[in-house]
A protein has these predicted regions:
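Short beta-strand elements that form the blades of beta-propeller/WD-repeat-like
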Residues: 54-56, 101-115, 125-131, 186-196
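Surface-exposed loop/turn elements that mediate protein-protein interactions on large endomembrane-trafficking
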Residues: 143-165, 206-215
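Short, exposed beta-strand-loop hairpins at the edges of beta-sheets
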Residues: 54-58, 194-212
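Acidic, glycine-rich flexible loop segments
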Residues: 160-200
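Mid-chain, structured segments of secreted extracytoplasmic proteins
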Residues: 30-61
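Short, exposed beta-strand/loop patches in secreted or surface proteins that constitute
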Residues: 6-10, 25-29, 44-48, 98, ...
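N-terminal glycine/threonine-rich, aromatic-flanked beta-hairpin/loop signature
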Residues: 2-41, 132-148
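Tryptophan-anchored aromatic micro-motifs
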Residues: 1-6, 80-94
Length: 221
């Protein structure tokens, strides 16, 4: 009620947000509660529900007061139904490193490739309202060369880390970075970075590719 700016549009059982980067979500009203089925489902207590107004308690325990718009032009904000997906890596990033092990020179390559795989991350406004933003994940190609001979090459996706991260963390993370760390008696060492988009939260993963091309993966301490 404090602004005339359109915030959301209700159509059927779906909420469409004015922010093009926020994904639409389904909802259901049961008695005095509205359930929002976003990436992280939430429930809000309804304080008032009439034909022209809707008040509810946010997760921050604030009363959010919404009113039905009487301005037909407000619907123009919702003309596009395409969610604006946020690209975390606009273009391919190439990195290479050279290491010497037992008088042999190795070159490790990393190619961070933007993909069309979508990651849904739930964020919360200062008022305690949740919205889902959508990001593109990356596929990272790694390879190791001795001179012109390729010793190892593989595409890495975050799905490969499903055994060491809970699904609720992995689902909201992107494969953000990768570094070639070196070569030793165990094999070729890489370190991957899994991060939550637009936050400082990240985890490191150590990857060792043995000389027989088998891979071991573990969380970095």
């Amino acid at each position: 009620d404090e602004t005339e700016m359109p915030l959301m549009r209700i159509e059927g059982d779906t909420v469409y947000y004015a922010n093009p980067q926020s994904a639409p979500v389904s909802f259901k009203v049961v008695h005095d509660t509205i359930y929002i089925y976003s990436n992280e489902p939430v429930a809000y207590k309804i304080d008032r529900q009439t034909e022209y107004s809707f008040w509810f308690h946010s997760l921050a325990d604030e009363v959010i007061k919404l009113h039905k718009s009487e301005n037909a032009e407000d619907s123009l904000v919702f003309t596009s139904r395409e969610v604006e997906v946020i690209s975390t890596t606009p273009e391919v990033i190439k990195k290479d490193s050279i290491v010497i092990y037992k008088n042999t020179r190795y070159r490790g390559y990393v190619y961070i490739n933007p993909s069309k795989m979508k990651v849904f991350k739930t964020s919360y406004s200062e008022n305690g309202i949740s919205v889902d933003n959508v990001y593109y994940d990356n596929v990272i190609h790694i390879c190791v060369y001795e001179g012109k001979k390729m010793l190892y090459g593989q595409d890495i996706t975050k799905k490969m880390f499903a055994d060491i991260f809970p699904a609720e963390i992995l689902n909201q993370a992107i494969l953000a970075d990768m570094n070639f760390m070196g070569v030793d008696s165990k094999g070729y060492h890489y370190q991957a970075t899994l991060g939550i988009p637009e936050s400082s939260v990240y985890s490191l993963v150590n990857m060792i590719i043995g000389f027989d091309c088998t891979m071991s993966i573990e969380k970095a301490e």
